[in-house]
Amino acid sequence: MTVLYQNRQIRELERLAVESGISEYELMCRAGEAAFKALLARWPEAQEITVCCGKGNNGGDGLVLARLAYENGLKVTVYLAGQRHQLKGAAAQAANACEASNLPILPFPEPLLFKGEVIVDALLGSGLSGEVKAPYDHLIAAINQAGQYVLALDVPSGINVDSGEVQGTAVKANLTVTFIAPKRGLYTDKAPAYCGELIVDRLGLSESFFRAVFTDTRLLEWKGVFPLLPKRARDAHKGSYGHVLVIGGDYGMGGAVRMAAEAAARVGAGLVTVATRPEHVPIVSGPRPELMCHQVAAADDLKPLLTAATVVVIGPGLGKSDWAKSLLNKVLETDLPKVLDADSLNLLAESPSQREDWILTPHPGEASRLLGISCNEVQRDRFQAINDLQEKYQGVLVLKGVGTLIKDESQAYYVCPAGNPGMATGGMGDILSGIIGGLVAQRLSLASAAQAGVFIHSMAADRAAEEGGERGLLATDLFPHLRVLVNP
């Protein structure tokens, strides 16, 4: 799997490169050249650009790009947020090279005027600490309102590369070229929407540099997920692939358990049983007779079902009634592996406990209740939030949202880059819990089931969106794609 880095680790990679004999200015020239090549590839018809530079090394990257564009015949306007004498080190060398090529470096005019087809954002980069301050907030707002294409160098100015947080305001780019290594914050929360297309350029650094710097964050990819899926034996039978028990579906919410149960079956569980309100039995087993369905009036009705189960999924449509609480308590008395979703998480927040045999799958709102903080605090640093969740509750945690995160007892973080806005619809979480439960039933570890389940779920949604569009995408549209994805 692709590894993702924090800002401090990128700085360590830069230090190792300089110690090996690659100067800071050489790295800057490589960055500017990589970004210029990306600009030409994305906008080959562009004749004129405006390059917006800050006073640090990100501004220096922009100056290198500006010079290369100018020397290759483009019309180039370079603006500097600050005074020329404030540029130091490699950035000053980049400015000297611009001036040697007769490319002037200008102060930002009032009113702001951006010329050409493309604006290059080289204002702040990854060195920002705290919220964006003047004059950069004003400049970022102007770039976002200009209407031209935007290329961001390393990171859209205003984005925290470790967490993905928008630090007050941020540039909305069409294309971001990030340097040396992928930064973990660019794949979660609001950052993907601000990056646009994301390209990673290693600037020619050898693999030995990357082996020398440890990182605990991985990007989920098909080549890493596919080996987690067990091969099927020729002499297999339904008992070989486990028995999922899905519990939930309080009054008016029978569809939730129905979707979770079918999702478990679609990813290959051998048997799937639903335990729900008596009124919901017909809507579960009628249209999908492969699902066994039992009416549960009281917690004791679960005893024989739990005895037969391999894994329990509890929460879809569960509600928070006394009935729901009694069912959850009965499940927690067992040593079966468990997937908790939806209202089972809200009930858990009222009586927190720790276990190693569960997977918790909160969205940000549920995570806020589990941690006793605001939803904004969860989203401000999703990596910290999932770390706190795992420490408080143990087991495996899945923090849903853009760039879903997974964390287990190994302390590794996994980030899912797949998924799309069409998933913002009812039932998607029910499908995910069923997928994960179905994979646990097939003897995947809890951590592997969470990783594979999240990725397959998001990939199925992407395939469904490609087929019919994001708007109007239904959770059940994922079913045919699930079957294809688990049979690569």
UniProtKB/Swiss-Prot annotation:
The keyword Lyase applies. One of its GO terms (biological process) is metabolite repair. (6S)-NADPHX 1 binds at residues 136, 154. Residues 1-214 are annotated as: NAD(P)H-hydrate epimerase. Keywords: ATP-binding, Isomerase, Lyase, Metal-binding, Multifunctional enzyme, NAD, NADP, Nucleotide-binding, Potassium. (6S)-NADPHX 2 binds at residues 317, 430. Binds 1 potassium ion per subunit. Its cofactor is K(+). Residues 363-369 are annotated as: NADPHX 2. Residues 221-488 are annotated as: ADP-dependent (S)-NAD(P)H-hydrate dehydratase. One of its GO terms (molecular function) is metal ion binding. It catalyses: (6S)-NADHX + ADP = AMP + phosphate + NADH + H(+); (6S)-NADPHX + ADP = AMP + phosphate + NADPH + H(+); (6R)-NADHX = (6S)-NADHX; (6R)-NADPHX = (6S)-NADPHX. K(+) binds at residues 58, 121, 157. It comes from the Bacteria. Pfam families: Carb_kinase (PF01256), YjeF_N (PF03853). In the N-terminal section; belongs to the NnrE/AIBP family. HAMAP family: NADHX_dehydratase (MF_01965), NADHX_epimerase (MF_01966). This is Bifunctional NAD(P)H-hydrate repair enzyme Nnr. It comes from Coxiella burnetii (strain RSA 493 / Nine Mile phase I).
